[in-house]
């Protein structure tokens, strides 16, 4: 009888350690959005941290074609800008043209008398930024010389010709008169006069064309003066010519006067180009020109400008992203990603945010999952989600505003004589790119750190808001979940989510259930030890009772034990 009583008590005590499924309680967990495969971004504290979503900030590819909408793009085809300006016969189609961007092709060539421009890059830049080849002829008077010289190397149709914007002056009869010509600028804009000097290949050619053994050209204004002497000598043959023409130019301001003095070798201007102040430019590119829309053009082709940085080309025209060395910079536009684990014990996937994120949330970044007498459910929290989104939205636009160029980065060219300047310019440009690349990475890592911190903060705010509502009616069980010690149906759960929960209504019930449950509840971690100890004690007591029974039976004679040797 004693043994039976002890076994019943032990069995009742062991069963009391097993949690009872009580419909008078509920579990509420808080969590955040997660995805199966997140995106790695860089922050100030971590080179690689996974987030639910990120936006690429570096444009690394072009369309492969130049868009002719948004800007007037002029295809130079077989002509360079300088050839078109001088009036090379095969470039006559470009006379009086206008452009925002003049595209020079690698296939461009000169098809007139061979020439050089001592300061080619500057003249090219002046004409390119002006955006027009508008030319105004002027009535220069050249007496005592023959005008409109031509060459077989520069044919217009079937006749010998020359650059249409220049006038090659040679001797008249057996003399070449000294020339003194003035041309005032009575207009209110700058005028660009292009002129040159001819360098014969031999002394015989010099006297044959200009009589004098050596000519001289002097062009002056109130602000400047240039005196050029011909450099007679043989040069490599180009289009059947060993001589050369050197091209110079003079800008005459309003109210100033152009003065030309020469006794031979003068390549005279026929008029002037109107200089305009503008944002037009020039670019070398072999990308085809197509009908499309883009505000940013590179030699590789047009690129979108919806990103703050680009790694396509240093040379750009239009409203373009800033060039950086990095091929990728990702801006976090979502929260820290903690993919959900498959096994979660008694509550399955209902574990809270401390353990994992929730995949499949479609109605918010933050939300609730619950388990009560009516089953399980999930719902997003609009308030905390919207607070996080409001802070993240606009980040990309703000970064673009900080970095987008509102001007173009022109090509820079230098003659061989200006090699040191070219090296210095290259060093300055490379340094600027290094600085911008560093600043871009720093900016992105700062923004990423801020995004992750604020999304974590919104999760904590939601948790604290829920804890303050529940007070003593629930217990924080340590994994982002609360155990609610009163019956909480779906309407009750909804009141917690929307902030209308009244803890006073459930206070007495919660306190009563808490004390009842706590009386028999054992903390996880001690249950196994107690069960094993109770099992061992039970076995020991059974053995003692069995041994006592055997001894009692032997004493009464009911059991006999024979030992044989």
Swiss-Prot record:
Its main location: virion. The keyword Transport does not apply. Keywords: Clathrin- and caveolin-independent endocytosis of virus by host, Clathrin-mediated endocytosis of virus by host, Disulfide bond, Fusion of virus membrane with host endosomal membrane, Fusion of virus membrane with host membrane, Glycoprotein, Hemagglutinin, Host cell membrane, Host membrane, Host-virus interaction, Lipoprotein, Membrane, Palmitate, Signal, Transmembrane, Transmembrane helix, Viral attachment to host cell, Viral envelope protein, Viral penetration into host cytoplasm, Virion, Virus endocytosis by host, Virus entry into host cell. Residues 1-16 form the signal peptide. Glycans are attached at residues 23, 37, 53, 68, 78, 180, 300, 498. Belongs to the influenza viruses hemagglutinin family. Major glycoprotein, comprises over 80% of the envelope proteins present in virus particle. This is Hemagglutinin. It comes from Influenza A virus (strain A/Equine/Tokyo/1971 H3N2).
């Amino acid at each position: 009888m004693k043994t039976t009583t002890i076994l019943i008590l032990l069995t009742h005590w062991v069963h009391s350690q097993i949690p009872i499924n009580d419909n008078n309680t509920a579990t509420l967990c808080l969590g955040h959005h997660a995805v199966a495969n997140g995106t790695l971004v860089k922050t100030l504290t971590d080179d690689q941290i996974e987030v639910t979503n990120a936006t690429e900030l570096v444009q690394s590819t072009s369309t492969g074609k130049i868009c002719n909408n948004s800007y007037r793009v002029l295809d130079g085809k077989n002509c360079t800008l300088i050839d078109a300006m001088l009036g090379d016969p095969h470039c006559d189609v470009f006379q009086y043209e206008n452009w925002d961007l003049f595209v020079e092709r690698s296939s461009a060539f000169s098809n007139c008398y061979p020439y050089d421009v001592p300061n080619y890059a500057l003249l090219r830049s002046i004409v390119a930024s002006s955006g027009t080849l508008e030319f105004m002829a002027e009535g220069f008077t050249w007496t005592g010389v023959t005008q409109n010289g031509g060459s077989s190397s520069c044919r217009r149709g079937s006749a010998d010709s020359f650059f249409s914007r220049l006038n090659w002056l040679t001797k008249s009869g057996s003399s070449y008169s000294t020339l003194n010509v003035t041309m005032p600028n009575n207009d209110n804009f700058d005028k660009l006069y292009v002129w040159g000097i001819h360098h014969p290949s031999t002394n015989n050619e010099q006297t044959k064309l200009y009589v004098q053994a050596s000519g001289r050209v002097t062009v002056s204004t109130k602000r400047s003066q240039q005196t050029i002497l011909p450099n007679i000598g043989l040069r490599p043959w180009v289009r059947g010519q060993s001589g050369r023409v050197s091209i110079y130019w003079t800008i005459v301001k309003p109210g100033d006067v152009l003065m030309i003095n020469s006794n031979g070798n003068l390549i005279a201007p026929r008029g002037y180009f109107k200089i305009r102040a503008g944002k037009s430019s020039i670019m070398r590119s072999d990308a085809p020109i197509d009908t499309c829309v883009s505000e940013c053009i590179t030699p590789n082709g047009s690129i979108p400008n919806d990103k703050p940085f680009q790694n396509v080309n240093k040379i750009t025209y239009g409203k373009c992203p800033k060039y950086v060395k990095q091929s990728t910079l990702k801006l976090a536009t979502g929260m820290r990603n903690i993919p959900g684990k498959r096994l979660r014990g008694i509550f399955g996937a209902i574990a809270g945010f401390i353990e994992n994120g929730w995949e499949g949330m479609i109605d918010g970044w933050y939300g609730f999952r619950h388990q009560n007498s009516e089953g399980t459910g999930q719902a997003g929290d609009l308030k905390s989600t919207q607070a996080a989104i409001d802070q993240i939205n606009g980040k990309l636009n703000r970064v673009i505003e900080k970095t987008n160029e509102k001007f173009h980065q022109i090509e820079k060219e230098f003659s061989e004589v200006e090699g040191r300047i070219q090296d210095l310019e290259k060093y300055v440009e490379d340094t600027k790119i290094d600085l911008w690349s560093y600043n871009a990475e720093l900016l992105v890592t700062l923004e990423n750190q801020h995004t992750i911190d604020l999304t974590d903060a919104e999760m904590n705010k939601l948790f604290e808001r829920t804890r303050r509502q529940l007070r003593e009616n629930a217990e924080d069980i340590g994994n982002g979940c609360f155990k609610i010690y009163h019956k909480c149906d779906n309407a009750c759960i909804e009141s917690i989510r929307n902030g209308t929960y009244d803890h006073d209504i459930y206070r007495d019930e919660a306190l009563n259930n808490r004390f009842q449950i706590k009386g028999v509840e054992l903390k996880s971690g001690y249950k196994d030890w107690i069960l094993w100890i109770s099992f061992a004690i039970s076995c020991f007591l059974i053995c003692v009772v069995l041994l006592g029974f055997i001894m009692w039976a032997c004493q009464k004679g009911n059991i006999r034990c024979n030992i044989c040797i």
